[in-house]
């Protein structure tokens, strides 16, 4: 435990000088005397000076202030005491409900499980959302990315997934809010409370208004809590909203740390930072972590370095499309762009596989015919193509679904559709069993029986 003093402050990056024989190690936590600010060592510059990132506001700090080393990395509460609580990046409670009362604290920087400890598995995780269960099914213990630009429904989709899985799957969840809107964090807390699943969720927030240090580390705080549950032999869900802001926080401090920016101004360590986080999100022989991550896509460009780096780590990608949202079809998942490693007849069965590929074929063909329809009109199509277009439009509408978490906005009650019903419904449309029904009947319904009932009222 040594003591040093601040010699330079540039934004969130602070240089501290220590005696040369007592320089703190990389990732060690430092405490500024007389101020509630924690720093994390990032670099050793030589001559006893270390460069650190502030985990909190740097207001009120000045050169010459004394800083104590703690001899350890930032540690956060883990275990059941964290459930139903909202914490910040350092594990301090921010929900005004008293101390956490944890029995154990873990450091946020941990080794990823070794190859020998990791476990593979092909068990499906049913979400109750038709389009996801059909074309990009999730694996238990897998990683899923929700990709989308601004305002196409990433957070709403994520809230629906948490609600469905918490109620139907009754496991523990950890939610890390990384650089998102504080309002959404608040809505999210109340949504969980109203659904009576709050006692199964630990919430960690480092929102948009927080300094970059908080946003850079809050995902690791949430992940550490999830790892504890996993190591106790549980199946945990880890939700990260939004992984792009984790990258962005790294970009903000990267230049201040003296690194040259790389492509599009991102930090040169982008792939490594992403890998450090993603490699820890994995299932071991003790338990599993299934992670669902929202990924903001800047300017709807999927080739941007940040989303492109994330793609490599995922088992399933759910792509939300502005074109589909503009048709009023929610969830606005693009069934042609979304993929899953599980979409394999050996994993999901031949019936499910054939139905999913059939749906994608019909929608792809409809996409190709749209140009002809726009120029020449429907009458110029062959009878077979006319039938295909009619079915495609029904499928497109049947891929929509009312959400439980959106009841307040839509006024229609949410629907949970089992995988069996989902496959049966789409199979029926592909086989022409519902050719006689109008396409409006398929819009915003749950199962296919509901569409048949709706058609009678039209």
Curated annotation (Swiss-Prot):
It is a peripheral membrane protein. ATP binds at residues 148-155. It comes from Pseudomonas aeruginosa (strain ATCC 15692 / DSM 22644 / CIP 104116 / JCM 14847 / LMG 12228 / 1C / PRS 101 / PAO1). Its main location: membrane. This is ATP synthase subunit beta. It comes from the Bacteria. The gene is atpD. It catalyses: ATP + H2O + 4 H(+)(in) = ADP + phosphate + 5 H(+)(out). The keyword Membrane applies. It is an enzyme of class 7 (translocase). The lineage of its organism: Bacteria, Pseudomonadati, Pseudomonadota, Gammaproteobacteria, Pseudomonadales.
């Amino acid at each position: 435990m040594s003591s040093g003093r601040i010699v330079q402050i540039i934004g969130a990056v602070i240089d501290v000088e220590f005696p040369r024989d007592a320089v703190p190690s990389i990732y060690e936590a430092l405490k500024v005397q007389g101020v509630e600010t924690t720093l994390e060592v990032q670099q050793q510059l030589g001559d006893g000076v270390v460069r650190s990132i502030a985990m909190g506001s740097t207001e009120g700090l000045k050169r010459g202030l004394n800083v104590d080393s703690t001899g350890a990395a930032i540690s956060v509460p883990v275990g059941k005491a964290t459930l139903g609580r909202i914490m910040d990046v350092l594990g301090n409670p921010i929900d005004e409900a008293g101390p956490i009362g944890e029995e154990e604290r873990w450091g946020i920087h941990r080794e990823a499980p070794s190859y020998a400890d990791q476990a593979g598995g092909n068990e499906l995780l049913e979400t109750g959302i038709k389009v996801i269960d059909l074309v990009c099914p999730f694996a238990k213990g897998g990683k899923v990315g929700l990709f989308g630009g601004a305002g196409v429904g990433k957070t709403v989709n994520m809230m629906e997934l948490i609600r469905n899985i918490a109620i139907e799957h009754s496991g523990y969840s950890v939610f890390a809010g990384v650089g998102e809107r504080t309002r959404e964090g608040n809505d999210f807390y109340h949504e969980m409370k109203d659904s009576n699943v709050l006692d199964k969720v630990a919430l960690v927030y480092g929102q948009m208004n927080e300094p970059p240090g908080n946003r850079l580390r809050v995902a690791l705080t949430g992940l550490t809590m999830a790892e504890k549950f996993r190591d106790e032999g549980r199946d945990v869900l880890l939700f990260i909203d939004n992984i792009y802001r984790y990258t962005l926080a790294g970009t903000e401090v990267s230049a201040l740390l003296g690194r040259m920016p790389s492509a599009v101004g991102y930090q040169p360590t982008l792939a490594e930072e992403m890998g450090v986080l993603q490699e820890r999100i994995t299932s071991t022989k003790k338990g599993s972590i299934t992670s669902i991550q929202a990924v903001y896509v800047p300017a709807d460009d999927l080739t941007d370095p940040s989303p492109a780096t994330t793609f490599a780590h995922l088992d399933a990608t759910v792509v939300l499309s502005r074109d589909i949202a503009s048709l009023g079809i929610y969830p606005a998942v693009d069934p042609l762009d979304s993929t899953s490693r599980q979409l394999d007849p050996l994993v999901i069965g031949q019936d499910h596989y054939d139905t999913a590929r059939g749906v994608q074929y019909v929608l792809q063909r409809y996409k190709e015919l749209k140009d002809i329809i726009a120029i020449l009109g429907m009458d110029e199509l062959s009878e077979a193509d006319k039938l295909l277009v009619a079915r495609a439009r029904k499928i497109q509408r049947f891929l929509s679904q009312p959400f439980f978490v959106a009841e307040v906005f839509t006024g229609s009650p949410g629907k949970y559709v089992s995988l069996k019903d989902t496959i049966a419904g789409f199979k029926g449309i592909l086989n022409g069993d519902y050719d006689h029904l109008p396409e409006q009947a398929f819009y915003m319904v749950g199962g296919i029986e509901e569409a048949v009932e709706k058609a009678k009222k039209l």
